[in-house]
Amino acid sequence: MADLEGGTALSLDRHLGASDTAEAIESYTEIEIPESLRDNLVLFLRMERKVLKEYDPAVCALFDRLFNSMIRANEGNPGTVAADEPTDAQGIPTADTEGARAFREAVELIDALPVDQAQVVVRAFASFFHLANLSEENYRVETLRELERNVSMESAVDTSNELVVAYGHLLDEVGPERTAELLGRLEFHPVFTAHPTEARRKAVEGKIRRIAALLDEHPYLGGSALLENERHMLQEIDALVRTSPTELKKPTPLEEADTIIDIFDNTLFDTVPQVYRRFDDWVLGEDAGSVPPVCPAFFRPGSWIGSDRDGNPNVTAKVSRRVAAKYFAHMVAKLAQECRNIGRNLTLESRYTAPSEELMNLWSHLVEMSETLTGRVADDLGFEPHRAVMLVMAARLEGTVARNADIMYLSPEELLADLRTVQDSLARAGAARAAYGPVQTLIWQVETFGFHMVEMEFRQHSLVHERALADIRSHGVLGKLDPMTREVLDTFRAIGAIQKRYGQKMARRYIVSFTKSARHMADVYELAELAFSHAQDVPELDVIPLFEQLEDLENCVTVLDGMLQLPAVQRRLAQTGRRME
């Protein structure tokens, strides 16, 4: 490493060589590093230094010196300060040891830098840490692939797939019928938030994603292909260092929704059905893709973005409506695109894949709905009927985005019914691999994401509800109410509007933070009823208590017992088959 003051570190007049880089990384971690992980860390450290030196040799020198101090500060205790090591009020170690001295040197160096220069150095480290994380992720993926390669096709269980392992245990313990029942009830519900510590620009995400793809290819390349790979990687790393990690202004809740959409487009939409498919591939074996699937659509993503208003005045009823509309439009457009892609490739001639009577009835229904849409593909009907139907279904989905009342799908269930008609027709005609291949993948995507993409979870503080009810009791629903009270009522009206327009699943969860009694649950149901003039307009809600303090957790059983006695909760339990969160 470099030492600006002429210490014992490496000189500045040359780049860090591969062997020096490897030694530095090994010293830094002080743990045994797998060779492939070390190679990637070496590669990225060399590239980071090359980019920094091209940008400004002085910045590269500062990076070297701080990196060197970081390594020495972690000697003997990688990654943290020892629990019994004395520190000052700022957490800086005060002991007279090599590691403590290195730590203090790094702090003093950073404190002495001008703000602009400190920002550049911090950005350099931030970009390198992104690259280090990519190295670890790449190694984890390679490890999982190696585990899969070691699984014998003769094995009863795929030991690399936790879902398959659990399924195998259930078969042994409770038998096939009970296992099928439990599998049908499986649900995985991750929730996306807009926590500041998780904020990352889409521009940065895109660069990291492209570097990850290049790193994945790197070990398999040679010659000019390898040179081009590394040139492209350097280009992306250079751009990463020069790109601000944060937006110029704080994103609005509507802009934060783009984070979910980006994750959806680049990961969830394609990856989730692949998870289902991998389970089916092992459980069904050679029959996979030619018989009805076993794996249910168990993934149910949720989101607090655009709906969590506890302490966030920027999330209003109007914002929630706009975020819901954004999710809906993107989701249905994505389904339309996928439906059209499948339709274009469903070129199965009718003389080899005869359409079922139900498929022809569906076509007749589509003709009655719109001769314009069906007229565009009418010539295909006698030749490739399944293709013709799927293309019209795609056009209906496009009409759904445009809110064309004449042709739009009113619900994802209506779309699923049409897809299953196509699937059943293909299967009966002997084209099982088309039925349970691409068409089944689209069915899984509709079952998983519906038209809503994510289930919005509304959250508000229990005290806000108490104050709103007190205000209403004093002035009446139509009286002069406090702005926050009006916003609370508008929130329930927004939930009702979202449910009517986009389906109940998009906005049925309502979380009460700092729940201290069953009364706080009752407050939500009461406010929901007060927000509407007609009882039939009141939305269905799954009100969920959030216990955030130790005292509340200790009292949670009493609160839940009281909650179960509420008439609104009993009514909701009757609708959900006695299930609640």
Regions found by a protein language model. Name each.
Residues 2-475, 484, 541:
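Often metal-dependent polyanion-binding catalytic scaffolds in large enzymes
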